[in-house]
């Protein structure tokens, strides 16, 4: 990911994040400071879909709320900022350190874990981000797999 593909969020993109975070807090009762609580809600929705108790169409909403809430939590907790990565001719939501040395993809992570029907991943993702930000030693391409996973896992 080349740094020149990053840009600040537009007002509409910022509103999208805010609306998804507010939905999670107000409508679902999710604690925005607790990745385990976010993960529990994600896991419950995934289980309902797998068991046929919820329509598959809820995936986009669940992934949107999960990505927005996790990214919001990490921005507040670690001083990260939202941006848009326009690499590969598509826009991807990212959170990055002020120095832009550490870039993470919370929406991509939520989508990946939804597709793979994986739960119990948000606390680990949050811990990985915390460690990388503390060290500012994130890999050059955080989407690339590493021995400990990627910034999408």
Annotated model-derived regions:
Residues 25, 53, 63-67, 75, ...:
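Compositionally biased, low-complexity repeat tracts
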Residues 1-60:
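N-terminal low-complexity, intrinsically disordered segments
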Residues 49, 53, 77-78, 113-114, ...:
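Generic structural signal for hydrophobic core residues of well-folded globular domains
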Residues 32-40, 61, 65, 89-93, ...:
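A sequence-level detector of short, solvent-exposed, charge-rich linear segments
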Residues 94-153:
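A recognition module on extended beta-rich or small alphabeta surfaces enriched in W/G with H and D/E
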Residues 60-113:
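Amphipathic protein-protein interaction modules
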